[in-house]
Amino acid sequence: MNIPTFAAIKQQIHKHIFYMRLNNIKKVFLASSALLSAMSMSAAERFVSFKQGDLLINGNDKVEIYMDANDCRGVSYAANALVRDISKVSGSQATITSNRKATILVGTIGHSAAIDQLIKQKRINGNLLKGKREKFIITVVDKQLVIAGSDRRGTIYGIYELSQQMGVSPWYDWADVPVEHHDSIFVNKGIYTDGEPAVRYRGIFLNDEAPCLTSWVKNTYGTEYGDHRFYQRVFELVLRLRGNMMWPAMWGWAFYADDAENEKTADEMGVVMSTSHHEPMARNHQEYARNRKGWGPWNYQKNKANLQKFFREGIERMKGTEQIVTIGMRGDGDEAMSEEADTRLMTNIINDQR
């Protein structure tokens, strides 16, 4: 009989529950089961050690991290998180640098000249990454730790794999998991990789957010809605857990309309946004509810032109971003559709939306 370790039990608990800090009292709210289906906490073999290894990455208490200025914005978010993580773990001063000979090199094929050059020189095996989805390799080349991704999320996952193996839990923020302290951080030679994920889209839905989460956000950020500062912290958690998708809170909040930076931040960080329930076509219901008089009744048979305009604006707004569009229609505020609604009407709605 295999008895699970305490760490394994804790990992499963953390996958199910977000712990929220509200007035110094722990509050909890349950995440959607979508979080659980395929988020791997760590899949690559162990390559970090703290006593000895092939490469000491924080020698002289300084760590330089190189990334191409032309790499994806999400890689920059993750690289800067790595700077903070190294400082938390070891106390060493970490910085982003333009020096290609930095201790750590992170980059995405096709977006990082340094990574592309290493592949061309056959210093790293590009066949492990080319044409792959959300895959990374971590290896030592000469005296440099290289983290290369097949795409932006592959690179991001590789960066956060290093953070986790150093001792930074994905839940360091939302569950107050203590960060480990180590004076020295070594990495061992080898090729460490993970991906492609078996499930293409993996994420969470912020469900039943009031009053706990909404109160915490108001007390923390002074807003009546989740702005990009709040969502950036949630997006980071999703990515550290190898997720890539999110459905935002919807009761009284409007993700797209409350803060224009919300959609931009999600796309920059590499999180695919979507909507659910009664929010089709990348529109939040609050965008309609706050102006019912202007939009008219939520009834496709009686108000088709205005609702088509409402839907069209959502699609136009999301242009150039990576999102999943929900189609169909439910009743106003997630109520039942009108009595005259039938499958033929729903078919027409979906055909029009397409």
Question: What positions do the PLM features span?
Answer:
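Core alpha/beta catalytic barrel or barrel-like domain that forms the active/cofactor pocket
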Residues: 198-213, 235-250, 272-296, 318-337
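Extracytoplasmic/secreted proteins, especially bacterial periplasmic and envelope-associated proteins
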Residues: 74-77, 81, 85, 154-161, ...
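Contiguous, structured surface segment used for ligand recognition
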Residues: 44-196
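Bacterial Sec-dependent N-terminal signal peptides
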Residues: 1-47
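Aromatic-lined substrate-binding rim segments of carbohydrate-active enzymes
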Residues: 253-277
